[in-house]
């Protein structure tokens, strides 16, 4: 304390944006820089309730899918600040599509190719063309916009940007067809380096969400 963001549920926003700051000022304690009210997590368009029997126990979900998967799903699929519907089926679709098929597939294909054709090493002789540089500069070129969205608690923008980068990295590897470049070692090395560097950057960006 003092907190950059005081995060509370929208149903108690008045108490934490009016009374709580007054208490802090009376006690001469610094105020948070921002108060942000998050929405509710719904089940079937309804607020979860024991009487309705529509509660999803997070501990049960974590036991099956893991904490990282649940955290990823909630951040991606529930727009921060708004109410959001969740279900076990949607969670499975999300983690299978994004983490297994998209991220996992990219990591498996590129590292397996590097192991076979680059002696499991990151190539050090690189000659970049425009397509390579577009991929390598994707995060640095958009860093200011990403920071702005995060500062505004638009967290799902951040994760959707990462998903977009994953699609582009997979497309880049497919389009460049390094398996057809074995007679052009320089080009093969550049493609492998660029793809591995995209995996490194994407993994770094995912770390706050799925450490």
Where are these regions (language model features)?
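NTP-dependent nucleotidyl-transfer catalytic core
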Residues: 1-10, 27-34
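Active-site-proximal structural scaffolding
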Residues: 6, 12-13, 51-55, 63, ...
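Secondary-structure transition/capping motifs at alpha-helix termini
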Residues: 24-33, 152-153, 209
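Catalytic adenosine-cofactor/nucleotide-binding cores of aminoacyl-tRNA synthetases and other
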Residues: 40-128, 133
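Helix-rich, typically C-terminal accessory recognition domains appended to large enzymatic cores
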Residues: 90-127, 138-210
